[in-house]
């Protein structure tokens, strides 16, 4: 199931917010630059598979949860 960069970025931003992390904290935990996290959340960057694994681990979520498309009619807030 392929999601757009914008959908993936939104999923990561939601997971980060739910975890109570700043972009800087997530970047540090995932071994990425803060600018990369910001670009990712804006839908301007698609992470490599190893980066996605590190992000999911840092966020304590399954990689597939980040890659799932919302169901039709599902409101994302």
Each model region followed by its residue ranges:
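DNA major-groove recognition helix of helix-turn-helix/homeodomain DNA-binding modules
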Residues: 48-65
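A short, Lys/Arg-rich alpha-helix, primarily the initiator
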Residues: 1-18
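Short alpha-helical DNA-recognition segment
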Residues: 20-39
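The alpha-helix within a helix-turn-helix
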Residues: 16, 27, 56
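Short, charged recognition helix plus adjacent turn
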Residues: 67-77
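Helix-turn-helix DNA-binding elements, focusing on the entry/boundary residues of the two helices
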Residues: 12, 23, 34, 49-52
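Residue-level detection of the helix-turn-helix DNA-binding "recognition helix"
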Residues: 17, 31, 42-44, 71
